[in-house]
Amino acid sequence: MSEIRNYTLNFGPQHPAAHGVLRLILEIDGEVIERADPHIGLLHRGTEKLVESKPYNQSIGYMDRLDYVSMMCNEHAYVMAIEAMLNLKVPKRAQYIRVMFDEITRILNHLMWLGTHGLDVGAMSIFLYAFREREKLIDCYEAVSGSRMHATYYRPGGVYRDLPDKMPQYLASDFRTSKELETMNENRQGSLLDFIADFVKEFPKSIKQYDDLLTDNRIWKQRLVNIGVVSANRAKQLGFTGPMLRGSGVEWDLRKNQPYAVYDQLKFDIPVGMTGDSYDRYLVRMEEMRQSNYIIKQCVKWLRENPGAVMSDDHKVSQPKRTNMKNDMESLIHHFKLFTEGYCLPEGEVYRAVEHPKGEFGVYLISDGANKPYRVKIRAPGFSHLAAMNEMTRGHMLSDVVTIIGTQDVVFGEIDR
């Protein structure tokens, strides 16, 4: 009689629910997962080594391409590390702008997660709802940086430029009538802050729509409740951070526990789960969007009342004004040196981390006194979460693997680096 053995199934790396180039070797008994072995590295681009070959100010763009749905949060950790080494003072207005865009980025990330997680488990319409709002926030990225994704907006010493006084508008085309164009540009008549204020006012209605679609939906709860349960103690042992840790009931958020920028001057709550399952993590992220919306509202109010500089006036680090370069030789030299050689950091090492939408995103930077880093180590939150895949899926059905990948909210740009 032949021996009965478990079936080995390859999941990915080309799979619509893999959220990138994830390959899972699944050992299954019928439809029950016995073992899940994640294979990573298929998107490895050697980012940490690339950063070592460029001056400090030329590596900000690499950060955008790590977690490519949470771009500005990646930049924030890197520029904070450089600023700490240089003892560089960042203008308060620039810090408020950074916090505002960190929270815009958090909403962008969670909308992407919500839409794709819905598609993974069969809720098709939520994807269209989520991307409706996401498009508006992507326009805010474009307004300040000219880019819809890889902004490179944060710079050591502040941000690239102040918020624009005029929000970009849709142009006439053969594909839209004049009436449609007028409707699309209705809330784009003022400044970027006016546009964001309008978004903040309307966004709670959108979150209620998502709630109505999913939160009490019987099928949604059947797919998420008691799936991928991780206890609070085990979540800490596994190195979970962000919504994965808070979903297990641990109230840990760097914005509250180790405040940076101006988070200690803002009011917001930290949502935590109770059971540590996929449904709790869904509820945590939904509430995080509400809290981010509230933080943005406070930032808009402060920025309207407090004009000022958005970049350090140390021109060894920040570029001089172009008007000065036309008349002042020293400004021209500083500009040339800044974009060819960059600047040197004192010898030493520093670790700076931010509360990224996916967890703790940290940059450990070692300087040997040159104009390039000696070593940059990136602490990606998704790496620890994916490492728990075997433990989270064991004993679940094959269809639940897709739910667990979705609830982890993994992006392989940061995991593979």
Curated annotation (Swiss-Prot):
Tell whether tRNA-binding is among the UniProt keywords. no
Key word Cell inner membrane present: yes
Q: Where in the cell is it found?
A: Cell inner membrane
Which PROSITE patterns does this one have?
A: COMPLEX1_49K
Q: Which reaction does it catalyse?
A: a quinone + NADH + 5 H(+)(in) = a quinol + NAD(+) + 4 H(+)(out)
Identify the stretch annotated as signal peptide in this record. none
Q: What is its main location?
A: membrane
Q: Which family does it belong to?
A: Belongs to the complex I 49 kDa subunit family.
**What is said about its interaction partners and assembly?**
NDH-1 is composed of 14 different subunits. Subunits NuoB, C, D, E, F, and G constitute the peripheral sector of the complex.
Q: Under which name does UniProt file this protein?
A: NADH-quinone oxidoreductase subunit D
Q: Supply the source organism for this entry.
A: Vesicomyosocius okutanii subsp. Calyptogena okutanii (strain HA)
Quote the gene name from the UniProt entry: nuoD
